[in-house]
Amino acid sequence: TKDKFVDVAGACAAESSTGTWTKVYDGKGSGVPMADKMKAVAFDLEPETNTFKIAYKVDLFELDNMSGLLAGVVGNIGGMKMLKAFRCLDIRFPRKMVQAFPGPQFGIDGIREQMGIERGPLLLTVPKPKVGRTAQEQADLARILFTAANGEYQGIKDDENLTSLPFNKFEDRCKAVLEVQKEIEEKSGKKKFYLCNVTHSNMETMLDRAGMIKAYGGRWMMMDVVATGFSAVHTMRLKNPGLAIHAHRAMHALMTRESGPGVYDKGVIFDFSMSMVAVAKIMRLLGVDSFHGGAPKAKMEDYGEAKLIRDVLELDITPETS
C-alpha cells in the first residue's frame, strides 16, 4: 500500500542516518538533540515505481571516508525485515565531498598525454584462456600485440585471476612483458602499455608489486577493486609510485546483480543490490584512472546501464539517474 511504502522510505532514511529500533533516553548527554539535527529525510517518493530519494546532512559523514559513508547510507538497509527488496540506483555526492577524495591521478586527458594519442580508442587485448600461459608465453604474446596493426595496437592486460601463480610468477611476468614493451617502444617510437594485475589481500604485497612495475618501466597497474575493497583502492591511489590504475570489477555481481524485471522500469525488483553506476562513481572518487565498466550486449548483465556508467567515468558533472 501507499502508506506502507511511505513508512518503508522513512525507515530507510532513519536506519541509514541516526535512527534506531528502540526507544532511547533523550535527557542530558544523550546526543538526541544533535541526532535530530543530523537525521536524513526521504523525499521524491514515487509509489508507482517504488523509488524514493534520501537526503543526508554532509556533517553526518567524514568527508574523505568512503567506507564510513557506505556503512551509513547502505550499511544496514538491506537487512531490514520490512524490505522485500532494495536497490541503490545512485549516490549523489556534494562538491565538498568530491573534493575530499583523491580522484584519478591521470584520468582521460592524462592517459592520452602519457600515450601521445589525442583522439581515438586505446586498443588492448585480454589474453584467453585467463590463466595457462607461463610468464615467457605472456611476453611472447605481448610482442605480437604490441606490433599488431602496423604498431597501432597499444596494449595487453592481465585477467582478474592472473596474480602470482606457480607457473606464472608475478615478478617474472612483469619483468618479461615490460622488457618487451621497452624494446618495441624504442624500435617503433610509439608508447605501449601493460595492465599488470597487482591484486592481493595483503596491501603491502600490492604496494610491493606496484613498485616492481615502476622499477621495470611500467606505467599502469591493474587491481580487482571489488575483491580487494574500497580501502585498498583508496590506499593504492595514495601510495602507489605514480602508476595509473585500471580497475577490474571482478566479484561485482554479488553486489550489483538484480534478477527482477524492473530495474529502471516498473520498480519490480527481487533482490538487494547496488547499481554498477554507483560502484563506478565510488571507484572514480577513490582514484582509479580507468574502469572495467561493462558493455552493452556483452556476456555480463548491464540492465541498460552501460551509457550511465560511461557518463559517470567521463563527465565532470554526471546526470542524475531516474
Can you say where each PLM-predicted feature lies in the sequence?
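Acidic (Asp/Glu)-rich catalytic clusters
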Residues: 112-117, 146-150, 171-189, 211-215, ...
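N-terminal capping/small domains of soluble enzymes
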Residues: 1-152
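Active-site mouth loops of central-metabolism enzymes
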Residues: 1-3, 119-140, 193-205, 253-275, ...
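Glycine-rich, proline-tolerant flexible connector loops at the mouths of alpha/beta enzymes
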Residues: 153-175, 295-300
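A cross-domain feature marking catalytic cores of carbohydrate-active enzymes
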Residues: 127-129, 160, 196-200, 223-225, ...
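N-terminal active-site wall of soluble small-molecule enzyme domains
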Residues: 173, 177, 185-194, 198-214, ...
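Well-ordered, non-membrane alpha-helical segments in soluble/globular domains
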Residues: 5-10, 66-69, 138-142, 170-178, ...
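Catalytic alpha/beta core domains of metabolic enzymes, predominantly
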Residues: 207-210, 216-322
